[in-house]
Amino acid sequence: MKANTMLFDTHLHMIYPDRLKYPWLSKVEALNKPYRLGNYLRSAKRLGISGCLHMEVDVAEAQIRDETALVSELIAQSGGLMRGAISACRPENADFPELLEWATTKVNILGFRRILHEMPDELSQGQLFRDNVKRLSGSGLTFDLCVLGRQLGLAAELVDHCPDVQFILDHCGVPDIKGGEFEGWAKGMSALAERPNIIAKISGVIAYADPDNWGLDDIRPYVEHTVQCFGHDRVIWGSDSPVCNLGGGLETWVAAIRALTDGWSTDDRAALFHRNAQAVWDI
C-alpha cells in the first residue's frame, strides 16, 4: 500500500458571520452557519493536510479589506498551517489599482479572485475589468477564475488578454456533474488548457454531483479529463471546504481524491497534492 502523500489545501473558506456579512449564504441553507478555524484544524490534522490557503468567501463588497484583516488574524492563530490568502476584488471598479497597491503591502495576500459564475457574462468582457486584471502582470499575484462550464470560453478570452498573469481555474471549471454535462465542458477545458498561463484546481467537485447518489465513477471522468488537458504539472488540489459539505464533506472528498489517484506515480501525486501549489506561490 502506498503511503499517503501530504496535502496542501489551496481552497479553504472560513465563515465568521459575527465579523462579516455574506449576502449569498442566505440562499444556501446548508452552508449558512459558522465555519471557524478550529473546525478545520481538527480535520486537517486527521487527514494529513500540511498547509492551506484561505479563499475569499464573497463577503459584502464594503468588507473586502475586513475579510483580509480577519484572515491575517487566523493565519497567526493557525500554528503555521494557513500560509496565505486569496483576496476578493472588483476589477470592474475604477479603484482597483488602489486595492492592488494596498494588497502588495500585505505579505499574506498571494492572489485575487472575483466570483464570475453567478455574475452576468458581460462582466469579464468589460475593457476596464480586463485591463485591471492585466495590472497583476509582474506582481506575483495570481487570479482565480470561478466560472461555469458554459463560461469557459469567456475565461479563455480573459486569459488571452492577460498573457503575463498566472490564472487558476477553480473547481475543474464547475461542471454540472449531477446534470450529466460533459462534452461541452470537456471541449471548453481542452481549449482553455492550451493557454500556458493557467492551471487547474481540482477542488470540491463532489459539490456538483448528486449529493445522495454520486460515486467515484461519477466524478472520475471530470478529474481525469482535467489532468489530461492540463498535465500533471499544471493541476493543484483544494478542498473547497465547507462548500464540499454539499457533496459529503471534507473527509469524503479527501478519501475520493486519494482513491482516484491511487494508480498514479508517487511523483504525480505529490505534484497534485502539494508540489505544484508550493511552486506557484513560492511557499
Which residue stretches match the model-derived regions?
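Short, electropositive alpha-helical surface patch
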Residues: 62-81, 165-169, 219-228, 251-260
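Mid-to-C-terminal alpha-helical segments outside catalytic/metal-binding sites
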Residues: 1-8, 31-51, 225, 229-236, ...
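Active-site gating/metal-coordination segments in enzymes
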Residues: 65-151, 157-159, 201-205, 209-213
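Generic structural signal for well-ordered alpha-helices
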Residues: 37-44, 68-72, 96-101, 133, ...
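Divalent metal-dependent hydrolysis catalytic cores, especially in the metallo-beta-lactamase
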Residues: 26-33, 39-62, 80-90, 110-117, ...
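Catalytic pocket-lining loop regions of alpha/beta-barrel enzymes
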Residues: 123-236
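Conserved, mostly hydrophobic/aromatic
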Residues: 11, 52, 71, 85, ...
